Amino acid sequence: MSDDRINYLKNKLVQYPDFPKKGILFEDIMPIFQDPRAFGILIDLLLEAVETEFNNIDVIVGLEARGFLFGPTLALRANCAFVPVRKPNKLPGDLVVVSYNKEYSTDSFAIQKGTIKPGQRVLIVDDILATGGTALAADELVTRLGGELVGHLFLLELTFLQGRKRLMAPTYTLLTGQDEAPDGSEFA
């Protein structure tokens, strides 16, 4: 993987202290999507990871909301299906729903029944791996539908939160954030 391409993406990230609340250092990935060159580099690097780290993917599952920014494009380029995992009351039809713990609350994710067939090889994609709670909930949804979870793919990992240790499959990230929270801050 080219250091120049990785550095180009890293230089697009913007940190916002005390957002969305005091003590949080927010890593903003949105500038990547405002620059066509950066977005193209992102998709190329993610596709390279799919081709080298994971074999024969049938389905890419994108997590609401920022997994939707690149998940469908990646699925198109990888010639596989895209399936969204959404918050409650956002999908019609028969659903499988799981609850998961967040830092200060609980939340839920849902997936439509039948969108993943038993035995299909599934890759979960999202923007940032922090504590791993949302990805772990998606793992459970995939396995409940009978999918074979082959891995996770993230744009950015906040390594000091050790979310990778909670996940049920191999995990690949393009970028890593700081190894620890600065000045006792948390990351989001």
Swiss-Prot record:
Per its UniProt record, the required cofactor names are: Mg(2+)
Q: Which GO terms describe its cellular component?
A: cytoplasm; cytosol; nucleus
Q: What does this protein do?
A: Catalyzes a salvage reaction resulting in the formation of AMP, that is energically less costly than de novo synthesis.
Protein's GO biological process = adenine salvage; AMP salvage; purine ribonucleoside salvage
Q: What class of enzyme is it?
A: transferase
Q: Which Pfam families match?
A: Pribosyltran
Q: Which InterPro entries match?
A: Ade_phspho_trans (IPR005764), PRibTrfase_dom (IPR000836), PRTase-like (IPR029057), UPRTase/APRTase (IPR050054)
Query: Where would you find this protein in the cell?
Result: Cytoplasm; Nucleus
Q: What is its EC number?
A: 2.4.2.7
Chain residues that bind AMP: A130, T131, G132, G133, T134
What family does this belong to? Answer: Belongs to the purine/pyrimidine phosphoribosyltransferase family.
Q: What is its main location?
A: cytoplasm
Top-rank lineage group of the source organism: Eukaryota
The metabolic or biological pathway listed in the UniProt record of this protein is: Purine metabolism; AMP biosynthesis via salvage pathway; AMP from adenine: step 1/1
The UniProt keywords, alphabetically, are: Cytoplasm, Glycosyltransferase, Magnesium, Metal-binding, Nucleus, Purine salvage, Transferase
Ranges in a coiled coil = none
At the highest ranks, the source species' classification is: Eukaryota, Fungi, Dikarya, Ascomycota, Taphrinomycotina
Q: What is this protein called?
A: Adenine phosphoribosyltransferase
Under catalytic activity, the entry for this protein gives: AMP + diphosphate = 5-phospho-alpha-D-ribose 1-diphosphate + adenine
Under PANTHER family, the record lists:
ADENINE PHOSPHORIBOSYLTRANSFERASE
Return one GO MF term.
pentosyltransferase activity
